[in-house]
Amino acid sequence: DKYYNKDITTGTQAFNYGMKHLRERCGDDMFIVESIAPLFPYQYANARRVSCDAWGEMWHTNYMMNSLSFGWWLDRVYAYNDPDHLVMGDRSEAENMSRITTGAVTGYFMIGDNLTTKGSYVGTEISQEKVKTYAVNERVNAVVRLGRSFRPAYGHKVSGSNRSVDLFTLETEDAYYIAYFNYDEGVKEGELTLNDLGIDPETISGGIECWSGNSVKVKEGRLSYNLPKHQAEIYHLYKK
């Protein structure tokens, strides 16, 4: 017996053949997410994971954002970038918020905690409570629903143990978004010069920080920030 197509002689041909068959069988009713798949050919999946085995620790967030730092453009190829399952578990509040922020700035959101209350493998109460706290922030979720990957502000500046960009931006028709991560153990504070990020301060009418809902302070073209250990913030600036 023979179970192969003799006309296929390369790995790329085999990948195309198999994925074309899978896509046809799935139809338009199934969302296809590739994990550690080749970047190309790309036309068979709706999304592709930009990093794998990222959990809830800060160094995992740093690792995931390293992948986005250099793979942000892939949401121009696939419909969505996948930042891996977002796990909170027993990590700190700051780590939880930062990990959820990775989903917001990637444009794709999939909770990784076990939330089941019945069965042979029941989830933990702490995971259930944290999801109700951190996965339902409407301002943050509105960023997720944009379905867009932020771009690194400075591609040549990296930090943290996994060497990631810490500052990302996104422009939409009516707003600018800035995401800032603190991968370090200490407080990060200072000012961001909006012009350096390609944002004309004269076009801004105001803004908020999405996690807290606090107003953003922009003075003389600079945005003030104060990020506690392992904290991430998302600044939503309104266009005039």
Feature roles, as predicted:
Residues V105, I178, G207-I208, H230:
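Hydrophobic, well-ordered secondary-structure elements that form the walls
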Residues T10-Y121:
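Glycan-recognition surfaces
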Residues V187-S212:
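Beta-strand-rich binding/interaction modules
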Residues Y78-V87, G112-G186, D200, S215:
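Glycan-recognition and catalytic regions of carbohydrate-active enzymes
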Residues D1-T12:
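The substrate-binding groove and active-site-proximal loops of carbohydrate-active enzymes
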Residues V218-K240:
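C-terminal beta-strand-rich structural cap/linker in extracellular carbohydrate-active enzymes
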Residues D1, S35-L39, Y183:
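An acidic- and aromatic-residue-enriched active-site/binding cleft used to recognize and process polar
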Residues K20-L22, R91-S92, R99, S164-T169, ...:
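Generic recognition of flexible, low-complexity loop/linker segments
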